[in-house]
Amino acid sequence: MQNKIKTVKELTVNMGPQHPATHGVLRLVLELEGEVIKKCIPYIGYLHRGVEKLSEDLTYVQSLPITDRMDYLSSMVNNVGFCVAVEKLMGIQIPERAKFIRTIMGEMARICSHLVWIATHALDIGAMTVFLYAMRDREYLLELFEMVTGARLTVSYPRVGGVRCDVNNEFLDKTYKFIEEFPRKVEEYETLIDRNRVWLKRTKGVGVISAEEAINWGLTGPTLRGSGVYYDVRKFFPYDAYDKVDFEVPLGKNGDIYDRYKCRMLEFRQSAKIIKQCIERLPDGSILAENALRIRMPESPLKIDKKDIIFDVYIEDKQIQEFIQKFTEVYASVEAPRGELGFYIVCDNSSKPYRMRVRAPSFVHAGVLPKLCEGSLVADVIANIGSIDIVLGECDR
């Protein structure tokens, strides 16, 4: 018998932009040789809303709500990042109570975001039960957000100079009760996953990023720390009340999908620890600085015109000039669930930013996908995307 020569057919396929496992409208063009990926080209921009350009026509107060729409899974952190940058620009010192409230809300948003991540990431790989457990617990936190802010996702709760409204004892009691029980819930997730042979096979040794590669790519957050690099904005450049609480920064060793997963699971416990300390140490006092930026409502509901609908800034241009110099620049960052979220603002002596640039961690992390996917199997693409936890609203802005 003559030996038949087997040829491997090369194929180009589109994954997305409507694929459910791309966690948004991400399109990947994959060049395959059999089941091995030879080339991976990510295409982004399908969810571009022009957040940076919109801010140039809005006042500092009016720009706040559009930051909600970037990473919509943790909008509270987006708001805080923008407020921290403007406060740094104008020299506004926020009250201690507002710092602790922001920290509580920020860590609750981190937990919410990580719950969506573990739910969808596990579901992508084949573990469905974790999805039900995680979304159950996230729903309770969203109800707590609604109790204080009136919204579940796009909250617009922080303000330049503090927070919009105070928290009451009912909210603090319910949050404290949840946080005390939450570590046991995290153990439930781990019990369902860590003994799953399919999960371990598809995460250990897959999607490896070395520490040097992670730094060179500009990765931050759990994706960077999973490679063993110690960097957390909350530790290196503390903001709000992070310099007044005790917490650890989880690190991985191998830089694979499993290590990135373990880092986020450990962050669950550290976030609970931070919230518990903040509630126990929450001081009394004001929630808004005296020189905070405010809006002026229309004087009479019977005299509303186009100008009144777009609220004027309470601190007018002349008052802003007391705080900033012409073309002052500032960069401030916060530790978002996905990594370092930075805001670079250029001011030109008016009540509107001359230029705002957002350093979105999802945008940076999307760039590492070719490195992760090329040379791996098609089935590993889904696991790799989930492990870096990108949100396309933040990536495309």
Curated annotation (Swiss-Prot):
InterPro entries: NADH_Q_OxRdtase_suD, NDH1_su_D/H, NiFe-Hase_large. HAMAP family: NDH1_NuoD. Belongs to the complex I 49 kDa subunit family. One of its GO terms (molecular function) is NAD binding. This is NADH-quinone oxidoreductase subunit D 1. The keyword Translocase applies. PANTHER family: NADH DEHYDROGENASE [UBIQUINONE] IRON-SULFUR PROTEIN 2, MITOCHONDRIAL (PTHR11993:SF10), NADH-UBIQUINONE OXIDOREDUCTASE 49 KDA SUBUNIT (PTHR11993). Coiled coil: none annotated. It comes from Thermodesulfovibrio yellowstonii (strain ATCC 51303 / DSM 11347 / YP87). It is an enzyme of class 7 (translocase). It catalyses: a quinone + NADH + 5 H(+)(in) = a quinol + NAD(+) + 4 H(+)(out). One of its GO terms (cellular component) is plasma membrane. Its EC number is 7.1.1.-. It is found in: Cell inner membrane. Keywords: Cell inner membrane, Cell membrane, Membrane, NAD, Quinone, Translocase, Transport, Ubiquinone. It is a peripheral membrane protein. The keyword Disulfide bond does not apply. Transmembrane segments: none annotated.
